[in-house]
Amino acid sequence: MTTQQTVKIQLVRSPIGTKESHRATVRGLGLRKLNSVSELKDSPEVRGMINKISYLVKVL
């Protein structure tokens, strides 16, 4: 049985004033309010989403 690798991300900047696609990416990662933390499966799809909004989030 393999264990899933996870990645924790925290929203550190407000998505107000950003592109609509970036706001949708923030919501897609499960982040809502400022400083909210989400733990997700570490996959290429999630890594791409994090890379897209790297200026808004911090990887913990």
UniProtKB/Swiss-Prot annotation:
GO terms for cellular component: cytosolic large ribosomal subunit. GO terms for molecular function: structural constituent of ribosome. The lineage of its organism: Bacteria, Pseudomonadati, Pseudomonadota, Betaproteobacteria, Burkholderiales. CDD domains: Ribosomal_L30 (cd01658). Part of the 50S ribosomal subunit. InterPro entries: Ribo_uL30_ferredoxin-like_sf (IPR036919), Ribosomal_uL30_bac-type (IPR005996), Ribosomal_uL30_ferredoxin-like (IPR016082). It comes from the Bacteria. One of its GO terms (biological process) is translation. Keywords: Ribonucleoprotein, Ribosomal protein. Belongs to the universal ribosomal protein uL30 family. The gene is rpmD. This is Large ribosomal subunit protein uL30. Pfam families: Ribosomal_L30.
